[in-house]
């Protein structure tokens, strides 16, 4: 299952990155652009070379979010909803909440006018991250282990960071 998790994470990261470029170019409506801009608010990160920047961003992206989010969403949250409403409802509810939570990475954007909602790209981002949630759940269920979902999530995040550093640049 690890090979499947790695393949799914890489494919999803590349696909979502290029969909953003195709639809929105390098504008603030592109989810990876706003993620990049958020990551690079710190001048110390902007001063790093590409390899150092990749390492500085990829290591925490591969560890903290995947472990914390998967233990919560595919572990605690899905278990509670499954007991209350069954596995299909749990899968759909988990995907919806996971997708909506990620609006804080893209969709609600800080601009010179203050906090702005970008409704169309935000909706696309929420649906894409809900789709990621479905993929993580599928891996969790079919492998019998939450660690396949953690692995896929980590690989997706690292692929996203690589896409940001290599394709979008600083």
What are these regions (language model features)?
Residues 38, 50-170:
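Transmembrane helix-loop-helix hairpins at the membrane interface
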Residues 1-65, 83, 113-121:
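Juxtamembrane helix-loop-helix connectors linking adjacent transmembrane helices
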């Amino acid at each position: 299952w690890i090979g499947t998790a790695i393949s799914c994470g890489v494919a999803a990261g590349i696909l979502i990155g290029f969909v953003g470029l195709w639809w929105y170019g390098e504008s603030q409506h592109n989810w990876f652009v706003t993620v990049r801009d958020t990551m690079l608010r710190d001048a110390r990160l902007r001063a790093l070379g590409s390899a150092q920047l990749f390492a500085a961003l990829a290591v925490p992206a591969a560890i903290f979010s995947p472990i914390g989010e998967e233990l919560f969403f595919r572990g605690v949250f899905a278990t509670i909803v499954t007991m209350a409403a069954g596995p299909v409802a749990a899968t759909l509810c988990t995907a919806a909440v996971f997708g909506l939570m990620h609006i804080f990475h893209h969709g609600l954007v800080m601009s010179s006018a203050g906090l702005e909602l970008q409704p169309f790209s935000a909706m696309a981002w929420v649906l894409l991250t809900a789709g990621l949630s479905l993929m993580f759940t599928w891996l969790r269920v079919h492998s019998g282990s939450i660690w396949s979902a953690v692995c896929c999530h980590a690989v997706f995040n690292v692929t996203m960071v690589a896409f940001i550093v290599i394709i979008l640049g600083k």
